[in-house]
Amino acid sequence: MTALNVLIYPDDHLKVVCEPVTKVNDAIRKIVDDMFDTMYQEKGIGLAAPQVDILQRIITIDVEGDKQNQFVLINPEILASEGETGIEEGCLSIPGFRALVPRKEKVTVRALDRDGKEFTLDADGLLAICIQHEIDHLNGILFVDYLSPLKRQRIKEKLIKYKKQIAKS
């Protein structure tokens, strides 16, 4: 297993609508394993494939961070949602920034697991928020897209400067 490089906003690949996975095979399972490694190394609770420059509809989630309740969602689709909630969200692709994002309190999602078997998951609380955040990534949407243009531009400018500093070191 290998940790992958996380793309930083405003990388254009973060704005791409990802393609569905056509077949879950060993190559896809390797991607899933590498995504979990990356997510834990970066101290995240969720990761979408486009964040590591893989433009396929794959999500890994572990809101507890203990490797006991891992979720793999391949080709996820929200079937139902209800309630209103929101928390200050962060994102591995937008380091150092957080913002309040409106989300649904509960979601029902259908997806494939790491073996290609279809399942349905009812989620609420942080898990529901994380699922929505990561599905947004698969659709080329970042949490900054929920912010005002001015706030989004300020974050973009700061992260461009941050990326230049990293490139120099």
Swiss-Prot record:
HAMAP family: Pep_deformylase. It is an enzyme of class 3 (hydrolase). It catalyses: N-terminal N-formyl-L-methionyl-[peptide] + H2O = N-terminal L-methionyl-[peptide] + formate. Removes the formyl group from the N-terminal Met of newly synthesized proteins. Requires at least a dipeptide for an efficient rate of reaction. N-terminal L-methionine is a prerequisite for activity but the enzyme has broad specificity at other positions. This is Peptide deformylase. Fe cation binds at C91, H133, H137. The gene is def. Binds 1 Fe(2+) ion. One of its GO terms (biological process) is co-translational protein modification. The keyword Iron applies. The keyword Hydrolase applies. The active site is at E134. Its cofactor is Fe(2+). Belongs to the polypeptide deformylase family. The lineage of its organism: Bacteria, Pseudomonadati, Pseudomonadota, Gammaproteobacteria, Pasteurellales.
